[in-house]
Each structure stands twice: as C-alpha cells, then as structure tokens.
C-alpha cells in the first residue's frame, strides 16, 4: 500500500492536470507492482470512496475545478468493490436479501451478453479486510467465471 501511495503521489506531482484521476495497478504473483494505466476524470470504481471515506470524487472534482482546497481524505471503513456481470444475476439477487453490509448499484438494460456489467457491489464493515474477502468468497458468486 505504501508503494502504491508513493507512486500515486509521484504521478500527481508530475502531471500538469487539475482534477480527479485514477492510477490502476497490476500485481504479479511474485508481488511485483506495475502501473496498469492512469485515467483522468471520474470513474465508476472511485465510487468506493462514497462508502469508505469522508470524501467523494464528484465533490473533489468540483472543488478542484473552482480552485477550492481539497479535503484531507480520512478512511472511515474498509471496503471491497465487486463487479457484477449478467451471468451472476440470480446469485447476486440472493445476496441482496441476505447481506446487510453490502450496497448494490445496478445499471439499466445491459443487454443479453453474459459478460456485460450488470452493476457493482460495495462490501463494507469492520476493519478486517480478510474477513470481508472471506464473506465474498463464501457466497461463491464470483467463483464461477462463466
């Protein structure tokens, strides 16, 4: 995490850009960290801040655009963002009824493609990331990658 933060700070200092951006990483099985890409602007994935921190990307983008100081980001809780695809629809509907620490956002008509993104699930709560991962794994929703 510290290396990721160092890289993001280095990228931010190097860019002549004002606004929200994302740095996406790839980690190999040996633990080597690579920058996958840099995305300027708002992203769906950054919505995780809505439920895990004291800021959201939309307000920070506006503050940046008008020259206001940005908030100091304070983590409020840990969280996972899970992508839900069409083929997982039935399985995720069951979890919707069962999980009180999951938040769901579904998209309108995504078509018939099984791999189309149906929505996102934010899994939050507690301070134990391993416990959240286990909760997700126990559902087996993401085990069957059709």
Model-inferred region functions:
Residues 62-146:
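Peripheral (often C-terminal) accessory segments that flank ATP-dependent C-N-forming ligase machineries
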Residues 30-32, 51:
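Contiguous C-terminal substrate-recognition/catalytic subdomains in enzyme active sites
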Residues 23-28, 38, 121:
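Active-site and channel-lining beta-strand-loop segments
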Residues 26-30, 107-109:
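Short beta-strand micro-motifs enriched in acidic
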């Amino acid at each position: 995490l510290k290396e990721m933060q160092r890289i993001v700070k280095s990228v931010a200092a190097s860019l002549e850009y004002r606004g929200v951006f994302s740095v996406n990483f790839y980690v190999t099985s040996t633990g080597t960290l690579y920058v996958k890409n840099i995305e300027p602007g708002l992203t769906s994935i950054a919505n995780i801040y809505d439920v895990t921190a004291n800021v959201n990307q939309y307000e920070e983008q506006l503050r940046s655009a008008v020259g206001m100081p940005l908030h100091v980001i304070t983590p409020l809780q840990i969280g996972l963002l899970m992508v839900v695809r069409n083929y997982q629809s039935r399985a995720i509907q069951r979890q919707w009824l069962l999980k009180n620490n999951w938040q769901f956002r579904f998209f309108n008509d995504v078509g018939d493609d099984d791999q189309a993104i149906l929505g996102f699930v934010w899994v939050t709560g507690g301070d134990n990331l391993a416990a959240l991962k286990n909760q997700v794994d126990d559902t087996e929703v993401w085990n069957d990658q059709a």
